[in-house]
Design a protein with these regions (language model features):
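Short Lys/Arg-enriched alpha/beta "domain-start" segment
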Residues: 1-234
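A broadly tuned preference for mixed-charge, low-complexity surface segments
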Residues: 155-168, 297, 303-306, 362-364
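Extended amphipathic alpha-helical scaffolding segments in membrane-proximal extra-membrane regions
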Residues: 204-345, 349
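Short beta-strand-initiation
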Residues: 89, 237-238, 402
């Protein structure tokens, strides 16, 4: 495959459970938008969605950024093909989201051949290996994130005494690698002889460039390639196409203006993708709370209803393109399917628990009724004996008490049987 030089901006994203409100320290700075920017943004996006992303209440996302500003070499390739690719690490951002979730993104930049782009991303998104393969990146980027984790994570005590590699994996509480949002652009002159769909597929799957070639060991099957490209692509204009997958969202374009790129960064990544990642990570944790921690289903449903009311947006924009991008991200992350099935399972468990509770209560009432009945039998026998002395009418007090007891118990038994039959 011919080589292609490209300009690349990527965001490596993860999340962990957090406690308390984040208070900036050290080089962390809070980021917000002005009232005029909020008003302008609300002309394009629903005001409630803008408020969710930039509001100041407990049901909105607060953002904190630390500038890194370093160019870090990342070694890619093996053996004789090993080489260092200069990678600009611009900044890291924390997103304190509702329901105790802390998301983060690492912004990187590249200007290199397409093959080096996928190699760098493949290396950096595997967070469990970074400490061994790139100590400088670990110190510059992961160390500040780990400090935030130690201060605010709900599981910070669990990492005491752990190796650095294991500690870093805690930054990806849900999964084993970082999610990636990436923008790759080229000049028209670089496109000649290169199949753009194949390149988009390789970027989106973080596969070696050229792996589509049937002779390559990583070559995908035609059925898989067609399914991905037919079902997950977003294509509106001739100069770009996007691919929305579970682990990545990839924009590939040519002759794209800086203003357009900034729009993708600030809005499609900064608002839509971050909000969708929040939803996905929330569903991951909800599933864990339900299946692993076995938390009460009724409490989880109450929380889910609150989440759906304050943090779930079926539509986010007045305009067609943001709506299209939003729904493509939902589909790529498989959000709707997981959300519906998880809600259904929790609701079923809640109904089962309520039925079990009702059954236990009915059983308790049944035994109390029996106890009361036995007490009533003796009292009734004594009353009848006073009114109609058993020795006079039956010749024996014992026979009298026995007759009354059997009669009353038979009546109670018939009543219980009739009641149970009607319930069925």
């Amino acid at each position: 495959m011919n080589t292609m030089l490209m300009k690349y901006t990527g965001f490596l994203c993860g999340a962990f459970s957090a406690k308390g409100r984040f208070v900036p320290y050290g080089n962390w700075q809070g980021t917000a938008i002005s009232d005029s920017e909020r008003e302008l943004c609300s002309n394009f996006y629903y005001p409630e969605f803008v408020d969710f992303n930039y509001g100041a209440n407990k049901n909105s996302i607060s953002r904190f950024t630390m500038e890194i500003g370093q160019v870090i070499p990342v070694e890619v390739g093996h053996g004789e093909d090993a080489r260092n690719v200069s990678t600009s690490v611009h900044s890291i951002t924390l997103y304190q989201a509702p329901f105790g979730l802390m998301l983060f993104s690492i912004r990187i930049g590249l200007q290199c051949e397409a093959g080096d782009v996928t190699a760098v991303v493949a290396r950096l998104r595997n967070i469990d290996l970074i400490h061994k393969t790139n100590r400088r990146f670990a110190d510059a980027v992961l160390a500040p994130l780990m400090e935030a984790y130690r201060r605010y994570s709900r599981s910070a005590r669990d990492i005491a005494g752990m190796d650095d590699d294991l500690c870093h994996t805690r930054l990806v509480e849900y999964g084993n690698k970082l999610k990636v949002f990436q923008i790759a652009t080229t000049d028209s002159s670089e496109r000649e002889g290169i199949d753009q769909d194949e390149l988009l597929f390789e970027l989106g799957t973080v596969a070696p460039v050229g792996s589509y070639d049937p002779e390559n060991d990583f070559s995908p099957s035609k059925a898989y390639y067609d399914r991905i490209m037919d079902g997950n692509c977003v294509s509106v204009f001739n100069n770009w196409k996007a691919l929305s997958l579970f682990d990545t969202f990839t924009f590939l374009g040519h002759d794209i203006s800086e203003g357009n790129i900034e729009n993708w960064i600030s809005n499609y990544f900064g608002m839509i993708y971050i909000s969708e990642l929040f939803v996905k990570f929330y569903l991951f944790r909800l599933n864990n709370d339900f299946r692993i921690s076995h938390k009460r289903a009724d409490k989880l449903l109450e929380q889910f209803d609150e989440f759906e009311y304050s943090c779930w947006f079926d539509q986010v924009s007045y305009n067609f393109l943001p709506r299209l991008i939003h729904h493509s991200m939902e589909e790529g992350l498989e959000i709707l399917t997981e959300k519906e099935r998880l809600y259904q399972m929790i609701a079923q468990q809640k109904d089962k628990r309520e039925k079990d509770d009702d059954q236990r209560m009915n059983n308790l009432l049944f035994y109390l009724t029996l106890f009361t009945t036995f007490s009533m039998v003796w009292d009734a026998g004594s009353l009848f004996n006073e009114m109609y002395p058993f020795e006079t009418y039956l010749g024996s007090a014992t026979e009298g008490f026995r007759l009354v007891s059997y009669t009353l118990l038979l009546a109670v038994l018939i009543l219980i049987i009739l009641t149970r039959f009607k319930k069925r």
